[in-house]
Amino acid sequence: MSQANLTSLSGLNPSCIYRFESAILPPFLNTHIVMSTKKFPVPLSYFSMPLGLFALGLSWRYGARIGLLPTWAAETLLAAAFALWLLLVIAYIIKIRFFRPEFLQDLQDLVQCCFISAIPITTILAGLAALPYQTLPAKGLILLGTAGQLAFAMYRAGGLWRGVHTLDATTPIVYLPTVATNFVSATAMAVLGWSDYAWLFLGAGLFSWLSLEAAILSRLRTGTPVNAPVRGIVGIQLAPAFVGCGAYFAASGGHIDTFALLLIGYGCLQFLLLLRLLPWMLEQGFSPSFWGFSFGLAAMTGCGFHLIAEQRLLFLGYFLATAGSGLVMLLLLATLNLARQGRLLVK
């Protein structure tokens, strides 16, 4: 495989990819495992796929509740997202067990490390998807994901305060460990009826977003360009405003007010700026990194449904709901085409 393909699939600099014959696990495991010399076929970043599908399914569930979509469409999408999430969790357990050096490389890499946050985020979303069917297990998933995201934030975000971060690693992926995680936790707490905790998590996500935004945009403006094969991760820039607005709706009761309109307005601006960047992002064609757009697009759909439900800015509401849903479906079709061509998994 060429260096360009490796970069496209893993998001890592090819010079940072190593081959391991074997590794000895920590003494407390008292186990010696022979490692494959091949790359693990499922990159950590692929958790962004169920992340986007879960988020869209939950937006569609709200759309069904207000009579805009059939219930079966939302529940079918959520079931597909749950199945994909479960497969990826199993795959990552296998990676930890039998591809330990690659797992440790994920943990230590300044960029890939952030994708680990997608695991607790999708665990929370899986709990929300299952909540109408199995309340107790669903609550368990939500609490497990929330505890996991806080633990990882302590490791990842807290660890960066020692001055170990770099400018090149300051891309929108940095939002995941403290912004996306806390917004999703806020939504889940609100759904469970724990409103005070919802506001706590919303505050954690909101102020984390504000503290990171200027640094990330400054790096995108003045730093070296993001590598062409992984430019899709810049699409994560769409997420904070719309995901934060969704969390605010969950915590505040779902009504359109001035603060919600402020968030939607900023999200719309990010959408327009990212549209302008699409030709630059697509210089080397579509890659799975474009799933970085999916969380923001799915949340944009939900914001559109809220506008429609409240009969506010109806044209904008229908545009956000239609564009968000359609573009996530386009991502799904493009990904299925990669799979058909045998270009989805790392070889």
Residue ranges and their predicted role:
Residues 155-156, 187, 211-220, 243-250, ...:
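Alpha-helical transmembrane segments in multipass membrane proteins, preferentially the mid-helix core
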Residues 76-87, 137-150, 198-209, 258-268:
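Structural signature of hydrophobic alpha-helical transmembrane segments
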Residues 60-73, 129-139, 187-199, 248-258, ...:
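Helix-coil boundary and interhelical linker segments in multi-pass alpha-helical membrane proteins
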Residues 203-263:
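Aromatic-anchored, glycine/proline-accented short structural segments
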Residues 87-98, 145-156, 209-216:
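Membrane-water interface of transmembrane alpha-helices
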Residues 35-59, 74, 78-81, 100-127, ...:
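Juxtamembrane helix-loop boundaries in multi-pass membrane proteins
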